């Protein structure tokens, strides 16, 4: 039996950069907070909590954090935040370490500029995802979040209105293209910017390729990880026996007979050591 790992699995550039930033700041002996969990992976967050890193879960908690004898350090995670969050930190005298993914920062600049120029911004993505909430928070005018093709079909723009369409970096690439086609048929393609991260596209393509050939597919990722859930959806369409796990303890394989290939992929917030644990476990026990 072969165990094959997808080419693009585990920490992406932005997540690794954010996690490394937290560990670097810990070396300085500071009081460290992250605005929201640094990554959507409970194991990583738990390890950092054991080292004293605290998580600010809401804007209200951030507002209540003020500089005293010491100046708290707040790290912005890779998902990025709305412009308002920076203003709160500055007003409260907090030290801000910005670990926003550069690809997300680029979207902030695009929507800020386009909305200032009078465009109605369309963000394709999950309205409850922190990255999308951050993007919306940089728009200076009308903004609409669309998550499904059905919502795109039902969207009607105001006559004479210009649209700028962007995407959550981890959105399903094929679904984004389909939504863009819907807008093009309506004549709503004034400004379309594919802001899906290249690593996300490659991760999804790689997972789909392996899943199409695999008898069993394992997707490793946090239960709150948007990109991990999308990987699971993609793999499940290609491979009937697809498992979505957060840790090795979640893995209860019921393998079909005559398994040739077990494929493994992982979300952008999944640490390499966890991927290796799952790989080794499958190789040894099956």
Question: What kind of region is each of these model predictions?
Answer:
Residues 1-286:
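The feature marks the mature, well-folded catalytic cores of soluble enzymes
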């Amino acid at each position: 039996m072969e165990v094959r790992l997808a080419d693009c699995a585990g920490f992406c550039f932005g997540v690794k950069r954010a996690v490394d930033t937290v560990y670097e700041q810990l070396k300085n002996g500071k009081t460290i907070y992250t605005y929201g969990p640094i990554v959507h992976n409970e194991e990583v967050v738990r390890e950092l909590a054991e080292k004293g890193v605290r998580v600010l879960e809401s804007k209200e908690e951030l507002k209540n954090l003020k500089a005293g004898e010491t100046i708290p350090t707040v790290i912005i995670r890779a998902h990025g935040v709305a412009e308002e969050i920076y203003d709160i930190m500055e007003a409260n005298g907090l030290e801000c370490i910005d670990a926003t993914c550069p690809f997300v920062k680029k979207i902030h600049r695009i929507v800020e500029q386009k909305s200032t120029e009078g465009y109605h911004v369309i963000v394709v993505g999950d309205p409850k995802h922190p990255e999308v909430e951050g993007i919306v928070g940089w728009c200076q005018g009308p903004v609409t979040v669309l998550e499904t093709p059905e919502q795109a079909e039902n969207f009607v723009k105001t006559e004479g209105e210009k649209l700028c369409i962007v995407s959550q970096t981890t959105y399903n690439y094929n679904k984004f293209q389909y939504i863009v086609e819907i807008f093009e048929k309506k004549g709503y393609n004034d400004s379309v910017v594919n802001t899906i991260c290249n690593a996300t596209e490659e991760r999804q393509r790689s997972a789909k390729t392996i899943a199409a050939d695999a008898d069993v597919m394992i997707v490793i990722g946090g239960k709150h990880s948007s990109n991990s859930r999308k990987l699971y959806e993609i793999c499940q369409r290609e491979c009937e026996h697809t498992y979505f796990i957060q840790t090795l303890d979640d893995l209860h394989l019921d393998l079909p007979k005559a398994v040739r290939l077990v494929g493994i992929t992982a979300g952008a917030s999944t640490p390499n050591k966890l991927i290796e644990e799952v790989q080794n476990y499958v190789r040894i026990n099956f």
